[in-house]
């Protein structure tokens, strides 16, 4: 069971009509990019996620924790023209080389998440994403917008992902500088992965043999190709049902308030 999904996003996204309301309804974590403020939000939300529940859902682990995914973007924003400029400026300010196909990561938020969750979470998964059909120098967010993908029928032909898994016990969390260097090294590896995708049209696939955490010999899955689609045509609509219901409820409440005020005014 995949369990719950929580996404860490920049605060401005929650003000998007309908979508932003839905994200707040589902408990997503919004950040202001001011650590003094964000640390309190992180502490509150992460404490809830790492607290055992008496009545955990089906699939809960032996620690009594509900299964969940916590998604964080250490870059803090989409790859775009403005994001590219900000990454270059950050690189110049810190005397480091900028990346070619990704944005430089910020380490503070991820480091705090891992430290708060390391007693309840064993692994961190790293995903590198590439969209088919994005020319070098252009950005996926400009070509595959929400409107173009869902309402104009122009989605990317394929979405390519490269996954890696890191044991949290092996990640250097004791020193902020060492962790920042470790994270930057992983991002330079991601930049090389994206370069290979540009040159070959695919990410490298692990088809060899290795060992799992128990020392058992296992074979890599290689390149996995699958098609993702909804089972029923109306499933996409169901995503918006909670937010639409909330919007209708708020509309009714405001109308009732307006009626009461008018009655009081007539008196």
Where do the protein language model's features map onto the residues?
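Generic alpha-helix detector with strongest preference for long hydrophobic helices that associate
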Residues: 3-4, 94-95, 144, 234, ...
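Catalytic lobes of large eukaryotic enzymes
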Residues: 45, 49, 56, 87-232
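Soluble catalytic domains of membrane acyltransferases
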Residues: 1-139
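Alpha-helical bilayer-embedded segments of polytopic membrane proteins, i.e.
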Residues: 221-262, 267
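Intrinsic-disorder/low-complexity, polar/charged segments
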Residues: 29, 34-37, 80, 175, ...
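Conserved beta-strand termini and adjacent loop/short-helix elements that scaffold enzyme active sites
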Residues: 10, 31-33, 127, 164-166, ...
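Proteins with a high burden of low-complexity, intrinsically disordered sequence enriched in S/T/G/P/A and R
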Residues: 1, 23, 172, 259-267
């Amino acid at each position: 069971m995949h369990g719950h999904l929580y996404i860490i996003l920049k605060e401005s996204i929650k003000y998007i009509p309908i979508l932003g309301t839905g994200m707040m309804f589902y408990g997503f974590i919004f950040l202001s990019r001011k650590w003094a403020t964000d640390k309190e939000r992180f502490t509150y939300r992460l404490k809830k996620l790492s607290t055992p529940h008496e009545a955990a859902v089906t699939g809960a682990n032996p620690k009594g924790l509900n299964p969940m995914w916590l998604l964080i973007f250490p870059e803090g924003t989409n790859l775009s023209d403005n994001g590219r400029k900000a990454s270059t400026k950050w690189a110049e300010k810190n005397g480091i080389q900028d990346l070619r196909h990704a944005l430089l990561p910020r380490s503070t938020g991820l480091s705090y998440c891992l430290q708060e969750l390391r007693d309840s979470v064993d692994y961190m998964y790293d995903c590198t994403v590439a969209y088919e059909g994005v020319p070098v120098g252009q950005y996926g967010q400009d070509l595959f917008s929400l409107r173009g993908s869902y309402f104009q029928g122009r989605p990317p032909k394929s979405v390519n992902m490269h996954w890696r898994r890191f044991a949290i016990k092996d990640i250097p969390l004791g020193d902020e500088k060492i962790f920042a260097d470790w994270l930057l090294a992983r991002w330079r590896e991601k930049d090389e992965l994206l370069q290979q995708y540009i040159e070959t049209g695919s990410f490298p696939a692990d088809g060899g043999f290795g060992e799992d955490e128990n020392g058992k010999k296992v074979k890599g899955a290689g390149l996995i190709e699958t098609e993702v689609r909804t089972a029923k045509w109306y499933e996409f609509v169901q995503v918006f049902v909670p937010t639409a219901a909330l919007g209708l409820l708020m509309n009714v409440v405001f109308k009732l308030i307006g009626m009461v005020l008018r009655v009081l005014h007539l008196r």
